[in-house]
């Protein structure tokens, strides 16, 4: 794979969702550079499904991406991506992606991107800020794949740094950091799994945690997992060797949460099957 110069894309997108006559509408869309979205569609009544697109197909050293999602009171938006986000090798520059997700009172955001894939020699900095009103609902995940294990290509060199801050009513509830510098140095921490993921659910309840735990024990997914309640946020952490079992695990939990909160089980976005 060729090297890329340190001069990269500058991409910024800001989306605002509001409830209008019983339907969530994308009322504001601003974008700079190659980040963009398709028009929302409505496979479920009133819920705005949106695909977030990055046309060049991948991210290289020097690229700077900023994603801002704002869900207003009582609005309900679901965002996903049509495929994995690929972070390619760097010739020296760092690829940076910052995500800010904000949900107002009684709003509901489902942030369900497909996995990030970090190629060997990638230099990446990821930052996620989640700001929720206490009466909001949120389910979202991040899946990280280091190298391309299906091709026996491992992330032996490179650096990925990440930070997630989770606020409720502007109070910092949860902060997490990630630092991976080649899997040779990280093998003990990740137990030699090339993939890990985190799924966040707010608000947490004992009943919901019990339902999810029972499901995970029953289906015995092909992943290693742990489920914890962190000050009212349910966090499901997963280690795996392939994308499909991890995605299946998260998608099933997402359906369980939807059933518990809204009384019906949604169909997965069709784009996940392509």
Curated annotation (Swiss-Prot):
UniProt keyword Hydrolase present: no
Induction of the gene: By urea.
Domain of life of the native organism: Bacteria
Localization annotation: Cytoplasm
Any one Gene Ontology molecular-function term assigned to this protein's record: nickel cation binding
Broad class of where this protein is predominantly found: cytoplasm
InterPro entries tied to this protein: UreD
GO cellular component: cytoplasm
Swiss-Prot/TrEMBL keywords: Chaperone, Cytoplasm, Nickel insertion
UniProt keyword annotation of Cell membrane present: no
Pfam family, one: UreD
Entry-linked PANTHER family: UREASE ACCESSORY PROTEIN D (PTHR33643:SF1)
Similarity annotation: Belongs to the UreD family.
Task performed by this protein: Required for maturation of urease via the functional incorporation of the urease nickel metallocenter.
Subunit details: UreD, UreF and UreG form a complex that acts as a GTP-hydrolysis-dependent molecular chaperone, activating the urease apoprotein by helping to assemble the nickel containing metallocenter of UreC. The UreE protein probably delivers the nickel.
Protein's UniProt name: Urease accessory protein UreD
Organism: Proteus mirabilis (strain HI4320)
Lineage per the UniProt record: Bacteria, Pseudomonadati, Pseudomonadota, Gammaproteobacteria, Enterobacterales
The encoding gene: ureD
